[in-house]
Amino acid sequence: MFGLSPAQLIILLVVILLIFGTKKLRNAGSDLGAAVKGFKKAMKEDEKVKDAEFKSIDNETASAKKENIKEKEQA
């Protein structure tokens, strides 16, 4: 991974822990997790809106087709 050996990664993690401390890293992890959760929630809501729009368009198209068929039958 990134040209680093496992030993180098462990040393890097230890240095990061020493610099930032576990409390700051825990808070940063919590903040990152909350941001990801919010992003996923927004994506789901956006999908629901799109689905509702597609359903309304499908309903409009179906009703327009029915009206068109009725007009052709009456003609």
UniProtKB/Swiss-Prot annotation:
Broad class of where this protein is predominantly found: membrane
Sample GO molecular function, one term: protein transmembrane transporter activity
GO biological process: protein transport by the Tat complex
InterPro entries, per database record: TatA/B/E, TatA/E
Compartment(s) of residence: Cell inner membrane
GO cellular component terms, semicolon-separated: TAT protein transport complex
Membrane topology: Single-pass membrane protein
Keyword field contains Cell inner membrane: yes
Annotated transmembrane regions: 1-21
Signal peptide: none
Keywords recorded for this protein, A-Z: Cell inner membrane, Cell membrane, Membrane, Protein transport, Translocation, Transmembrane, Transmembrane helix, Transport
Recorded family membership: Belongs to the TatA/E family.
Subunit structure: The Tat system comprises two distinct complexes: a TatABC complex, containing multiple copies of TatA, TatB and TatC subunits, and a separate TatA complex, containing only TatA subunits. Substrates initially bind to the TatABC complex, which probably triggers association of the separate TatA complex to form the active translocon.
NCBIfam families: tatAE
Function of the protein: Part of the twin-arginine translocation (Tat) system that transports large folded proteins containing a characteristic twin-arginine motif in their signal peptide across membranes. TatA could form the protein-conducting channel of the Tat system.
Protein name in the entry: Sec-independent protein translocase protein TatA
Gene field: tatA
